[in-house]
């Protein structure tokens, strides 16, 4: 599984948090980024499709509920898998 630079930045926030985060949480913890809410939504969907993250439940925010996400592997597992797959490409 190869991730884009922006996807890796999302993964770094998730790995560093140590807990499931919502889209709003990701935006709050990435204040130095100029991501829009819709951009984070697209990045999260891409990470879900690649199997890098999974839905970990729902959290209530004011009057609505939002999904929270967590990584499917540790940072170390991701890099080990990436290195292994690059070494064994035909």
What are these model-predicted stretches?
Residues 10, 41-50:
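Basic amphipathic alpha-helical segments that dock to polyanions
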Residues 51-57:
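Glycine-centered, phosphate/nucleic-acid-interacting loop/turn motifs that mediate DNA/RNA or nucleotide
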Residues 78-90:
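Amphipathic alpha-helical dimerization/coiled-coil segments
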């Amino acid at each position: 599984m190869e991730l884009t630079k922006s996807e890796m930045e999302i993964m770094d926030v998730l790995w560093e948090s140590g807990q499931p985060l919502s889209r709003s949480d990701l935006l709050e913890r990435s204040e130095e980024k100029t991501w829009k809410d819709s951009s984070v939504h697209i990045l999260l969907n891409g990470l879900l499709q690649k199997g890098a993250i999974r839905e970990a439940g729902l959290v209530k925010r004011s009057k609505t509920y939002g999904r929270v996400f967590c990584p499917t592997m540790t940072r170390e597992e991701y890099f080990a898998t990436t290195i292994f797959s690059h070494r064994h490409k035909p």
